[in-house]
Amino acid sequence: MFTPTICRFDYGQLKVTIETGMMARQATAAVMVIIEGTAVLVTVVAQKEAKPGQTFFPLSVHYQERSYAVGRIPSNFFRRETRPNEGETLTSRLIDRPIRPLFPKDFLNEVQVIATVVSVNPKVNPDIVAMIGASAVLSLSGIPFHEPIGAARVGFINGAYVLNPTPEELKQSDLNLVVAGTKNAVLMVESEANILTEEQMLGAIIFGHEQQQIVIESINDLVKKAGKLKWPFTPKIVDEKLRSCITEEDKKDLSNAYLITDKQERYAKLNEIKTNIIERILKENETVNAEQIQDILYNFEKNLVRQRILKDEPRIDGRDKDMIRALHACTGILPRTHGSALFTRGETQALVTTTLGTSRDLQTIDDLMGERSDSFLFHYNFPPYSVGETGMLGSPKRREIGHARLAKRALMAVMPNIEEFPYTVRVVSEITESNGSSSMASVCGASLALMDAGVPIKSAVAGIAMGLVKEEDKFVVLSDILGDEDHLGDMDFKVAGTSEGITALQMDMKIQGITPEIMQSALHHAKAARLHILSVMNQVISSASSTISQYAPHIYNIKINPEKIKDVIGKGGAVIRALSDETDTKIDISDDGNITIAALSQKSAAFAQQRIEEITANIEVGRIYQGTVTRIADYGAFVSIASAKEGLVHISQIAEGRVEKVTDHLKLKQQVSVKVLEIDRQGRIRLSIKDAIADTSEHKIEDTPVDSSFEESQKQ
């Protein structure tokens, strides 16, 4: 019934199996990729025809993790997987980015790739498995797809590159880099580094690209055995007659419009010119439509901008290829936030805030690789007004999640650990203007806002986006690209780091590959740009503030005997809740007896510490304490002493002589002095009021004075 085709190969220390023909046979193509027990089912379905009027390539990639892959039932209310989590979204982007440029330019059929994680070995991250699966399934499908890609994760441990390190090895690594590429060129890089040099980063990219060649070779062998026939595809032919309708005057007008340096003015002028051209041609030729004319105009604009750059003419905004836009930075602009900064680079601007929280604010991440907590959160918001548009507002989109993760990666290397700075730190970047590289503006703004908040980061961090225009063997690398240069160019190469080295690198290609020579040039120019930006930032603030905001929680730590934890927490958490309310603090206790007190003032924290010390103090037999009557029974009264410990005053120990009714002598919430008579093996405390009164003249009461009216009544 089944005739699966199987390909097996060694990938470094890992055993890889790619199987097709067993499952999902109604999809255009499907593969199961298994690496050392981690298995991902990857499918692709493509429509045979493009939708009428389709103007862009509708590729969608979905990476989804199943809890059964690790033998768990989802812990949510519905007990099933729901919306994609952040990790799934990021991996979907990781798969999408290297395969997108390998489809033909004019191929507009809808294509959907789905990668489902069905089994997980905790030592093998499924993201690389899914990337290999996507490459294999597209190559087998017959869909127009240029060639297979390989994918590799590279670590850097003790000065040596490590291929596909395990999660445990990554904890010791100074680098976490994912690289994907074809046989001859690199297509995508995503990395986080612990301040490595440009040479070390380039070496890691080359190492990963070399190692993944076995993946590409194996997929090609599998295609020879089980690949489907290639779909017939004819690239769109340019209508030369229609193109000739664009007059020299039209070209001159468009060319002059690209000399306008202000983005909104330029867009308005271009829109006016193109609208006039389209209306004129439609009147002259009723057989064409507006989309055809727009395609020709787009190609002219793209060629115009690219040729100017290749000829070393001024860029769209008048700069040369290495020039950085005007920079402006300031901190402390929001009076009630814990830290804030406004970073502006040309027409790109980020308002960034830092908020300090306690351990209660830690983010718990529960995915297939296990549960963990994160004390550093980074969120990025891109509202439509930042580009002068209207639009829907809602939950963050894939792009916002991806940009936030890149900015977070850039800062991780300089963040203090939780022992050095016991706060949960949340950074939020609000993009208020955008014309290229808003993620790198977020990095710069976040570095400033963290310092303003008093977070002791090891060094300032800046980021820059590099671009590329490449025609045959000639190429030009651009520093600090505009949005149009990103759109019309061939590469988006983002580099972030300190003055000492790189902390994050992301590269996306729109053409089929980039050579080591181009990457080396981009890294060289990015370093110069980064150092320039850092020099401007350091003039504003060069080190963390010595104090944190008066509106931020001040955190204090004390240590108690772990056996006393239950006394501080109380039954059902009653004691710790009452203590927090009484002292106006937040109190957290760990299993080892470490207590964290978060307060807005030192006075509140000191009060909370005093009360905790009272609660955890040992009760001494024979000592007199001040207490409060908490319950009254026929046989006696219960009195709370040392803040939380309760003892019994038997009716015979209330007063000298016979006591008929307890309520004749005591009432609820009455303050009384009691003497500790005994603590039995079960920890129960026996108290005496009459002995405390008798000893008053001989012993000094430790706490507040005895209620004199009660003492007098007892004597009577």
Swiss-Prot record:
Residues 553-612 form the KH domain. Its cofactor is Mg(2+). It holds the Pfam family S1. InterPro entries: ExoRNase_PH_dom1 (IPR001247), ExoRNase_PH_dom2 (IPR015847), ExoRNase_PH_dom2_sf (IPR036345), KH_dom (IPR004087), KH_dom_type_1 (IPR004088), KH_dom_type_1_sf (IPR036612), NA-bd_OB-fold (IPR012340), PNPase (IPR012162). GO terms for biological process: mRNA catabolic process; RNA processing. Keywords: Cytoplasm, Magnesium, Metal-binding, Nucleotidyltransferase, RNA-binding, Transferase. Its EC number is 2.7.7.8. GO terms for cellular component: cytosol. It is found in: Cytoplasm. The keyword Cytoplasm applies. Residues 622-690 form the S1 motif domain. It catalyses: RNA(n+1) + phosphate = RNA(n) + a ribonucleoside 5'-diphosphate. It is an enzyme of class 2 (transferase). Component of the RNA degradosome, which is a multiprotein complex involved in RNA processing and mRNA degradation. Belongs to the polyribonucleotide nucleotidyltransferase family. PANTHER family: POLYRIBONUCLEOTIDE NUCLEOTIDYLTRANSFERASE, POLYRIBONUCLEOTIDE NUCLEOTIDYLTRANSFERASE 1, MITOCHONDRIAL. Involved in mRNA degradation. Catalyzes the phosphorolysis of single-stranded polyribonucleotides processively in the 3'- to 5'-direction. This is Polyribonucleotide nucleotidyltransferase. It comes from Hamiltonella defensa subsp. Acyrthosiphon pisum (strain 5AT).
